Curated annotation (Swiss-Prot):
GO terms for biological process: auxin-activated signaling pathway; regulation of DNA-templated transcription; response to auxin. Pfam families: AUX_IAA. Residues 70-82 have a biased composition (Low complexity). It comes from the Eukaryota. Residues 209-313 form the PB1 domain. Keywords: Auxin signaling pathway, Nucleus, Repressor, Transcription, Transcription regulation. Aux/IAA proteins are short-lived transcriptional factors that function as repressors of early auxin response genes at low auxin concentrations. Residues 180-189 have a biased composition (Polar residues). It is found in: Nucleus. This is Auxin-responsive protein IAA18. The gene is IAA18. PANTHER family: AUXIN-RESPONSIVE PROTEIN IAA17, AUXIN-RESPONSIVE PROTEIN IAA18.
Amino acid sequence: MEEEFKDKGLPPTLLHLIPDGREWKVKEADGEGSRNTNLDADEDKELELKLGLPGVQQEERAADSREKIQQQQRESSSEPSIGCFPTHSKPTTSIGTTGAKRGFFAIVGATLEGYNQSHRDTEECGKELTLGDENMAGERKKGCCPSPPCSAAAHSSNPQGRGAIPPVVGWPPIRSFRRNLTNGSSFKQSPERQNDEADDKAKPICKKRPLVKINMDGIPIGRKVDLQIYDSYQKLSSAVEELFRGFLEAQKDLSCAESGEQGAEDKIFSGLLDGTGVYTLVYEDNDGDRMLAGDIPWKVFVSTVKRLRVMRRSELPHDMIGADPVK
């Protein structure tokens, strides 16, 4: 064939170098069948039901598309180049060459189109990622980084759909009545109650005992006296005389009764407060100290007295005798 073109003086073209178009027709038929099968497989995969997150299916589709593109590139690279075609002595017809040309350009065009589309998709994804990173960096510099809309919607829907979360009580758990007691003690008091407490504090502290024990030397039986009904030492002295006069009359000496002495009881109780009589009134305070009755004001005496005793003057210490009573 080359000799014929040399005789005519014309250079050979690409289509005249292809000896036979049967192989290209077979490849074209195979390519169309493979495309049809691939499309059917893609449709089956799209209609297939799978369990997973929403973004997983998109990732799988992208991976499948990348695998298809790589497979097509490998097939195109494995095909023989134009310069390696074998030469045959048989002449070729124009019909075979046109069919081979169409099949070859269809395969190459589809491969290039798929590769360009995947390249554009990857570039767009890269641009979106870079823009998103730049926006996040700018927001962090400004000091405000809002959460994504999906998370915000989830947070906003949670309090509406669910009830209020109970407060943590710690471990071990506290019983309900103990928790109520602690909460009740922490509440502030009402203003009226606070005013009443302030008034009570302003008043002088006066510990008033309803009844105080009183004993007398020589009489084994004690008595009790209410200090609230008296307002002075003189009234208290007369009350003590009335309490123990009957006991003294029962225990008086027979010699005094035979001699007919009268008014002995009056002499006994005449000097209870000043210490000039046979007996003297002594009290014991909160600290346990013994003191003569009448040395402090009456109100203070009532608030501090713990016990009363009528003692003989001969048994008193010399420091206590001769104190001036307070009336």
